[in-house]
């Protein structure tokens, strides 16, 4: 594999570097080991952030686990918008924080927050499995990333070892009593944002805890109660509010409306708590002690369930969630959605998650796209700031493939328990004959807006309408990537929906607003929308955990977690096609199209790219595309297998391991 120099933000964008691991040995020999890293050119083997390491090499902890600080991504987060496309607002970016990159020959976890990574590493050191570490980390993320995920939300988890690849669906479900008109007024008009995203109305049945319990029963090693200890300790002792969390608290227009949330996130005089303030959560610690002793049942059928239902029903914007809804919830094992691309096998989540299928479609299109193959290694160039970006032609082809995949997503993707797959099989959307048909739509000029395709023997193309909410931004989310001592891996993504979810707080954690993940408009010109709201249904989800294998083997090559398919697809392309390390690929500018305007990450791309796309007919928008990617990549050093870990420089994530 040939790795290219890692992109660096321009000096005006470079901010504080996350501290590296404990006294570390440097992997200066990576270049000589055949990774071909151009260390001097861009400062490091592990992309932006390797600048604080000698010769840019990754740091490996000399002790059993890395001790990482709580330094967050520098720069204030932007104020969340007061209105939302599709009822949902994008999670704001929070600047750029160079990440040093981490590596380990044994075990490692990369998490969206350093304290969560520490918790996971503690469990790995104690002999825990990848699933054990993911559970411990998620319990801490509920505490340290309350804007992005928690026990009150939903999650997706992929697991792989040398024998099996498994998918676990912990997405929320709609309360039984809701109707498809939940977000419409009496005249059929859409309700405003305050009635859509805040309060009890948008709350679905949380699924994260049941999913974690299901995965632990299958692949846990340590006792369930042991996994709760790091989060309980942190909730009791407190943790300093990160700059990112502080900025999001200060900017949220709805959070202070709930008395419990107001008491937790704001001072007595009403001022939002600031960065560095010690935040203790005794209510959450008590909840965790109850769950550690009793499993998930108290959450779904006991005292916690009663309090959740009461909170939702008695809020100023009441919802329909009941104790019975909670008691009926089931996390589901599913079959991963896998496909081959060149020398890799890419596996993601199946519907109602959309990321696995979108990536399979995009890379299936790349595989048969002559213009993509002709580009060879000429898909990246350096911009004036010294960073890497795609060439206009590469960005054009990537965006058009995404446009086609998202057209099908808007037409077909929904809860498979309620909505049939085209011709009864989701694989029809990646069949060679179907992709060959779709390839004919990609030309020298952008499609602008692509129409959904018609798989063979499918009548659904005329049965369902197009989802007007399909361009809603992806949810706020937290991600994990874990490898344990046995080589088993976990990729996980979890979310509350919007930042801070419904803004309702109960028992020390926030509840989701997952019902905004459905289409608010149930019909399109009289035709039902596949992702319309219905009681007991799971919303379509953009959460995208992904695992890549060396083709034809059980050998894991790459583990990724992301909130949306497009940044994950960019990262996969960076590794599989463009010769980058996972850190370099994550740090590339975010770009692509979800079948709307072609979006480019503002401040990270050149005028040459913008104009090149416009000449190809693209409507280009420069937007502050945040992402929350985490990744693990297997490489070889002196004949030894080594894991490289990295977190998105746009967020405060970190890695820890031994």
Describe the role of every protein-language-model region.
Residues 38-41:
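C-terminal motif of bacterial Sec signal peptides marking the signal peptidase cleavage site
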Residues 43-46:
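Bacterial signal peptide processing site
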Residues 3-31:
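Bacterial N-terminal signal peptides that target proteins for export
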Residues 333, 474-477, 541-543:
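Short, small/polar residue-rich loop motifs at catalytic or cofactor-binding pockets
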Residues 69-118, 122, 130-294, 299-301, ...:
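Noncatalytic scaffold domains of N-terminal-nucleophile
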Residues 395, 415, 536-539, 577-627:
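Extended C-terminal subregions enriched in glycine
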Residues 143-150, 154-160, 166-167, 319-322, ...:
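Active-site rim segments in enzyme catalytic domains, especially the processed small/beta chain
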Residues 86-87, 371-495, 624:
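Internal maturation/activation junctions in enzymes
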